[in-house]
From Swiss-Prot:
Coiled-coil region list: none
Name of the featured protein: Elongation factor P
Any single Pfam family the record assigns to this protein: EFP_N
CDD domains in UniProt: S1_EF-P_repeat_1 (cd04470), S1_EF-P_repeat_2 (cd05794)
Name of the coding gene: efp
Keyword annotations of the record: Cytoplasm, Elongation factor, Hydroxylation, Protein biosynthesis
Similarity comment: family membership: Belongs to the elongation factor P family.
Lineage: Bacteria, Pseudomonadati, Pseudomonadota, Acidithiobacillia, Acidithiobacillales
Organism from which the protein derives: Acidithiobacillus ferrooxidans (strain ATCC 23270 / DSM 14882 / CIP 104768 / NCIMB 8455)
N6-(3,6-diaminohexanoyl)-5-hydroxylysine, modified sites: 33
GO biological process, one term: peptide biosynthetic process
Localization (cell): Cytoplasm
C-alpha cells in the first residue's frame, strides 16, 4: 500500500531499500528556498541499523502490510521467549532482540500483540500498563515524606523502577511500559 511522504508517522513499518524499516521519528521541513520534505528517522527491523532519510513532498512510500495477533506469554527458556497464539493455540518463540528490551514487563499469561509481516514476527506491543510485585526496595528514610523523593526498587521480573518512599517489598504496583515509570499501587 503506497502512502505519501507526509502521511508517514512514528510506528509505521515501511518497505524501503529491500528491507523493513520501523519509523521512529518524523519531521516536516519547509525551507525558505526549495521544496518541502519530510525527514524520517528509521530503524531496520532485520539488522537494527538506524537511518535518517529525507523524502520529497511528492514521493510515495510502500507501507508494509502488518497483521497484528494477540498472543499470551508463557515462559522463557534457552531458545527464547515462548508465546501462544490465542486463536489457534500454536506456540511461537521470539528472540530477545525482537522484544527490544521489553522483557522486564513480561509475566506469564500476559497478553501482548505480536505484529507479523508475511507470517514472520517483526515486533511486539505490550499493554500500556502492567502490574508487578516489588521484590526488593531500599528502606525509606525517616522524615522524607514531605518531599516527592523516590527510591529504587527491584521488581519480580528483574527490572528496577523508581518508586515513592512509602512503597515496600511485597507490594504490587502499576508500571508504565512505555517509559518504565511508577504509576500507583495496584
Amino acid at each position: 500500500m503506497k502512502i505519501s511522504a507526509f502521511d508517514i508517522r512514528p510506528g509505521n513499518i515501511l518497505e524501503y531499500e529491500k528491507g523493513l524499516w520501523r519509523v521512529l521519528k518524523t519531521d516536516f521541513v519547509k525551507p525558505g528556498k526549495g521544496g518541502a520534505f519530510v525527514q524520517v528517522e528509521m530503524k531496520n527491523i532485520e539488522t537494527g541499523t538506524k537511518s535518517n532519510t529525507r523524502f520529497r513532498s511528492g514521493e510515495a512510500m510502500e507501507k508494509a502490510v502488518v497483521e497484528p495477533r494477540t498472543m499470551q506469554y508463557l515462559y522463557a527458556d534457552a531458545t527464547g521467549y515462548v508465546f501462544m497464539d490465542n486463536e489457534n493455540f500454536e506456540q511461537l518463540i521470539l528472540s530477545e532482540d525482537l522484544l527490544e528490551g521489553q522483557t522486564g514487563y513480561l509475566l506469564p499469561n500476559t497478553e501482548i500483540q505480536v505484529n507479523l509481516h508475511n507470517e514472520r514476527p517483526i515486533g511486539v506491543e505490550l499493554p500500556p500498563v502492567v502490574i508487578l510485585e516489588v521484590r526488593e526496595a531500599e528502606p525509606s528514610i525517616k522524615g522524607q515524606t514531605a518531599t516527592g523523593s523516590y527510591k529504587s526498587a527491584q521488581m519480580e521480573t528483574g527490572i528496577t523502577v523508581m518508586v515513592p518512599q512509602f512503597v515496600n517489598a511485597g507490594e504490587k504496583i502499576r508500571v508504565n511500559t512505555v517509559d518504565g515509570s511508577y504509576i500507583d499501587r495496584a
